[in-house]
């Protein structure tokens, strides 16, 4: 038993068996009804061990997902529009000029025609959103350069006009006017991850700060663009760091939360780390769902590499979105395989609701 304080009382959490399962189901019902998990409760849940007990946690998280988000799994795809020689020193990334990873591609901005062609292919594969991702610290620092930004805006508009898919962007840090320009061009969602907790962040990046990233998220929200903001699990951070990250995302009221599972890249400072254990990843996903009941939780990088044949379990542990197709510098599995996995789980690929949008169907 672990003694914790909830938002309304002090109680004990059993750590195994039927007692744990009953506590989790009761707490899930309370969260579905509008209560919120306390940080102390969340930290207590990290002590759950053993596959059967973790399955109980995942089952309760899945009930929250069904009740608060429904059975539609948000499908998106990405394209690396400019790669390599990045000025930043993110320890997990093979595109950094400080530690270029083995076999990491280096090229300038792709042509509008090539990007639009990929957008149409992503739509044909079932993706509902298509994210244009560029290396560099960000538009705020003229990276991509200003003329490249204008070309990206024009490309976004052409995707809207010619492809049956919604364009998103991930162009690094930006100012409020730059966010407003993206909004005017038709961008409704922008990816800018916090990557880690504020406490752990200096261990993986030193060329910019965690607060720099938070400022960009706030600029996005102020411009009326949905924030697709999450992080990476498996960089050597503690469970406290993971919980702190989740609560920071809740405080920022982001709409979509990519959960990346570190796939260590040779040549990077984190390349020596072991891959995350799949059940550790499942536990993290489930706890994130308890903390973020209405957010879109997105399987992102590392899904295939870390989860392997257990990928489907994430979709029954709180996940309700995923990238399909390839990632920035690594390959993903064929979209048809993802669609088959969803069908086996009686889930529907599409566009998931953002917080406050889901309306459960009323029985007639």
From Swiss-Prot:
Its cofactor is [4Fe-4S] cluster; [2Fe-2S] cluster. InterPro entries: Aldolase_TIM (IPR013785), BATS_dom (IPR010722), Biotin_synth/BioAB (IPR002684), Biotin_synthase (IPR024177), Elp3/MiaA/NifB-like_rSAM (IPR006638), rSAM (IPR007197). Keywords: 2Fe-2S, 4Fe-4S, Biotin biosynthesis, Iron, Iron-sulfur, Metal-binding, S-adenosyl-L-methionine, Transferase. CDD domains: Radical_SAM (cd01335). PROSITE patterns: RADICAL_SAM. Binds 1 [4Fe-4S] cluster. The cluster is coordinated with 3 cysteines and an exchangeable S-adenosyl-L-methionine. Binds 1 [2Fe-2S] cluster. The cluster is coordinated with 3 cysteines and 1 arginine. This is Biotin synthase.
């Amino acid at each position: 038993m672990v003694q914790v304080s909830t938002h309304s009382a002090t109680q004990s959490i059993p750590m195994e068996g039927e007692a744990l399962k009953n506590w989790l189901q009761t707490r899930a019902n309370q969260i579905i009804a509008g209560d919120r998990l306390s940080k102390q409760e969340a930290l207590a849940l990290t002590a759950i061990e053993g596959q059967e007990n973790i399955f109980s946690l995942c089952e309760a998280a899945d009930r929250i997902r069904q009740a608060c988000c429904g059975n539609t799994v948000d499908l998106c795809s990405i394209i690396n529009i400019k790669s390599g020689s990045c000025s930043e020193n993110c320890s997990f990334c093979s595109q950094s000029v400080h530690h270029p990873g083995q076999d990491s591609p280096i090229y300038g901005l792709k042509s509008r025609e090539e990007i639009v062609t990929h957008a149409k292919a992503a739509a044909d594969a079932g993706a509902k959103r298509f994210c244009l991702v560029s290396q560099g610290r960000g538009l705020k620092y003229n990276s991509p350069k200003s003329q490249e930004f204008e070309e990206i805006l024009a490309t976004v508009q052409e995707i809207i006009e010619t492809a049956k898919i919604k364009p998103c962007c991930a162009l690094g840090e930006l100012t409020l006017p730059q966010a407003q320009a993206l909004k005017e061009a038709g961008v409704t969602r922008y990816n800018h991850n916090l990557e880690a907790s504020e406490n752990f962040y200096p261990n993986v990046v030193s060329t910019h700060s965690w607060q720099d990233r938070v400022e960009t998220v706030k600029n996005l929200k102020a411009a009326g663009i949905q924030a697709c903001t999450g992080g990476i699990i498996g960089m050597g951070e503690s469970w406290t760091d993971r919980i702190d990250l989740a609560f920071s995302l809740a405080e920022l009221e982001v709409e979509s939360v990519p959960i990346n599972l570190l796939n260590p890249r040779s040549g990077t400072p984190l390349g020596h780390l072991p891959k995350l254990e799949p059940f550790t990843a499942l536990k993290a996903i489930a706890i994130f769902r308890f903390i973020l009941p209405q957010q879109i939780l997105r399987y992102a990088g590392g899904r295939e590499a870390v989860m392997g044949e257990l990928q489907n379990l994430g979709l029954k542990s709180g996940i309700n979105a995923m990238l399909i197709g390839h990632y920035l510098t690594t390959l993903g599995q064929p979209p048809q395989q993802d669609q088959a996995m969803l069908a086996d789980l009686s889930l529907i690929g599409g566009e998931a609701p953002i917080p406050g949008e889901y309306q459960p169907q009323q029985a007639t």
